[in-house]
């Protein structure tokens, strides 16, 4: 089944569940996907959409919630905070008790604040926000609150594991350079890379923050990196800022390895080709990392959606697996859904995903799960973007090993 057909079928099923639940005595659980479904960043939003439909479909196949199918509502946030704010209002007006989103930390910052303020004004009718992929540290730091949960990594998790994995393999070296986009995510990455240097055992000899998606020629930046004589380049860059940086590095003959967070974004390997070989990424999934369990998940995901899970999809699926496990321990009171009870259940839930143990830290609502450090290689079983390259895992960290400490800036007020 193609992704397009799968998505259309998912929307049709959601519409049918809306009609079928109309006469039910129990209040239906409505989950609103508020994602970037159009415009230049829609490719990532559609990946989240596929993951949500896949896993909520699994939950519905198993009986849904309280004997009713979970209803899936969709809203296009058009890639920006303003659009997201409008769509969150519409979703709540349509009866959604839970908002899910993941493709932008800027959008996530808007949604989490809107949800927080709404909940302050509407005691007893609180809305949950399940963050599937927005990784800015502040979301579980200064902006943390009881009704927000993050199911993805953050800068601290990604760059601690990628550095330690490379160190353990003997490919990190001693001299490192940090180059990142100049906004909250890039600053988070730079701060993490600097903070980890002494403990893991490398020196950050220089660092650069640059404009986001405006630079066409990274040659001057690469010349600076080359002059620094480094072994590893840490970068949280994504999209063209990653591709153009790596192409400029290859053209200049730079020998340093790139330690990245988003090298697995669809299209990257197809565009970079041999340039990407040997470079590193740390993510929550690799189909070869956990034997039959991880490969079986990859094959089932492809069977349902038409493509292997990649980039943001696995983390979203695994987070919603935890959510589904939590729902098993929640019983609606007098036919009404209590989102506070659902939040408490998520805090106490644990599940075995295709990658291993997955749980939620109650202090700040940062999920805890394994991370896989992997390199671009021809030896990978599953290839990326129709090329001869894929991602070959060489180090897996448990959730306990991966997770970062609770940030001092998180002061979560609990209900009651």
Swiss-Prot record:
Keywords on record: Amino-acid transport, Signal, Transport
An individual GO BP term: amino acid transport
Signal peptide (from-to): 1-26
Superkingdom of this protein's organism: Bacteria
A Pfam entry, by short name: Peripla_BP_6
Recorded family membership: Belongs to the leucine-binding protein family.
General function of this protein: Component of an amino-acid transport system.
Protein name: Leu/Ile/Val-binding protein homolog 4
Highest classification ranks of the organism: Bacteria, Pseudomonadati, Pseudomonadota, Alphaproteobacteria, Hyphomicrobiales
